[in-house]
Amino acid sequence: MFLKRNRQTAKQKPLTMKDNRKKKTIQLSAAALGGLFWCMSTPLHAQEYTNFVLVNLDDVGYGDFSCNGAYGYTTPHIDSLAAQGVRFTHFLACQPISGASRAGLLTGCYPNRIGFAGAPGPDSDYGIHPDEMTMGELLKQKGYSTAIFGKWHLGDTHQFLPLQNGFDEYYGLPYSNDMWPNHPQQGEVFHFPDLPTYDGNEVAGYNTDQSRFTTDYTERAVKFIRKNRKKPFFLYLAHSMPHVPLAVSDKFKGKSEQGLFGDVMMEIDWSIGEVVKTLREEGLLDRTLIVITSDNGPWANYGNHAGSAGGLREAKATTFDGGNRVPCIMYWEGHTRPGSICNKLASNIDLFPTFAEIAGAPLPVRKIDGVSILSLVEGRKNADPRTSFVYYYNKNDLEAVTDGEFKLVFPHKYVTYEAYNPGNDGQPGNLANVTLTRPELYDLRRDPGERYNVIAQYPEKVIELNKIAEKYRKELGDDLTRNKGKERRSPGKKHAPVH
């Protein structure tokens, strides 16, 4: 039961940045009015819509759910959704670092297309550009109530905060929970100010006890669902955990066999269980798509305070698959096939157009990179909507490209977690800098851990993947080959005038 998606015509004249912002505003205003009249004239039971619950975890690796092989703790609520829904095995975060990954998730774009890089902190001068349509704004076109509880990371000044970018409610952190005065390297490497917790546009406190966050976010999520039970809603639950520093409430302290990290994961699983229970109690489970994923792989040099990449190579902040490949589970009663596994290539930037298709919301005028993966969610035969993915990192380095079966890695510098032992109990271990001097090719079908270079055996694959890379170098550029790219847009800048 889908609302038909509005499609833009090929002859539509491109808008300027200023015009596009007006267009975005007009779309939202018109949609709000249309939704008002629709609600006034149509009985609630006759309205057909799908709610969206998007749970985006922080630094959860591919192997950190028990259905993916986690050890020393269990995640029964997550596992139950996997058993009833679809588990993706080749789901890639658009970049292996928090801020950029979240910017891509919420706009459907490779982060470098929208000028977004890295993990902005309290001293950063950039954030989400006002002309970029976020997932919140996308769904508000169709009358959705929207909320984010948790980590934002798309900029920390007023113009960048959620309430100015498509969300009705916000409670949480503007950036990572380690960007505070209690950082283990404070005064040596970092000089962080006090960490604000926001409630809407106002600071509710500084350096909040982080053991409260998972429970606080969950309670607000439950309240939001109950308040909006009779109308469409989008809940973005962006837990601050298990990013370091780890913190857990008393009710889960000491519960796992894997120490504090396991305790934190058990509490996150409880949180997801509370959300599912609320949806069931309100009779909404059959009209809600639930997505559980992570922003990037684990921060492996934190040792027993870090997650597991599940045997994949390297971890967060690298474009080997330990950094980009993340768990993803989707459940949508009546649409996902119980216990199904999807091995097809997909990315977090694909959620934006997927939600748009389900909600019948028009896509933004500005170009996006995501493709709808609704066909994969529903398990349609021979569905294969994403045929390639490019791995960008740093400001604009194109480090690798894949077609889902083979991955071509280009020469680049990266940090390795494999040269030193990891740290422990909240202290990070050392990292080593490595330079890859020649391209390498990996057969991900047989070697998902990227250990065996088969570039000599598959010269035709190298040619195919290089063609894909060249296409993106022309569009988005590549600092490694000194290509500027013709289709990159600018991020928002602090204190920049908004027209």
Language model features with spans:
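Formylglycine-dependent sulfatase
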Residues: K18, L28-L33, T42-E440, P448-K467, ...
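N-terminal secretory signal peptides that target proteins for export/translocation
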Residues: M1-T25
